[in-house]
């Protein structure tokens, strides 16, 4: 119980320093914390602000978020790389392939940089991103370009470039 209390206290300090305890723009503190938790799970530190922008762009366009990390959270498979088509059919409020909008709450405990990215996304028109190889995450607004990169990702996955828990 003491460890959880320490985590909550640390989160509140970091949220306050990131400006999340106050409602900012369209999102309240709970929603920003949820966005930050997805950013933390989906991206490398260098990509946090771009992942934040993708989330916002998808929400603004009324698109499903389709974030693998939210499905992994629902399945208790955090840290997985691969997401099966069957997994995207899971009936869960955290399945952002089936449910539009943000999941009902955070999927993890985000760090300060993810919190800052949730509040201050980078400018861009991206609505897709994919990590095609370790340390090679690409962002685009083109579904066609995303499709080409997805083929590259699958090839790299089969070649063992990722440590996957398939």
Regions found by a protein language model. Give the residues of each.
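Bacterial extracytoplasmic/cell-wall-associated proteins, especially those involved in peptidoglycan
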Residues: 1-166
């Amino acid at each position: 119980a003491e460890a959880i209390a320490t985590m909550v206290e640390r989160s509140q300090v970091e949220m306050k320093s990131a400006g999340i305890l106050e409602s900012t723009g369209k999102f309240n503190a709970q929603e920003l914390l949820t966005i930050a938790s997805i950013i933390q799970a989906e991206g490398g530190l260098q990509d946090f602000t771009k992942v934040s922008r993708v989330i916002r762009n998808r929400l603004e366009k009324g698109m499903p978020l389709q974030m693998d990390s939210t499905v992994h959270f629902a399945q208790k498979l955090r840290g997985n790389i691969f997401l099966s088509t069957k997994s995207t059919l899971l009936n869960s409020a955290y399945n952002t392939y089936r449910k539009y909008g943000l999941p009902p709450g955070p999927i993890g405990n985000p760090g300060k940089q993810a919190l800052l990215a949730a509040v201050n996304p980078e400018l861009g028109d991206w609505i897709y991103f994919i990590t095609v190889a370790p340390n090679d995450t690409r962002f685009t607004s083109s579904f066609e370009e995303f499709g080409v990169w997805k083929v590259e990702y699958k090839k790299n996955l089969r070649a063992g470039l990722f440590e996957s828990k398939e």
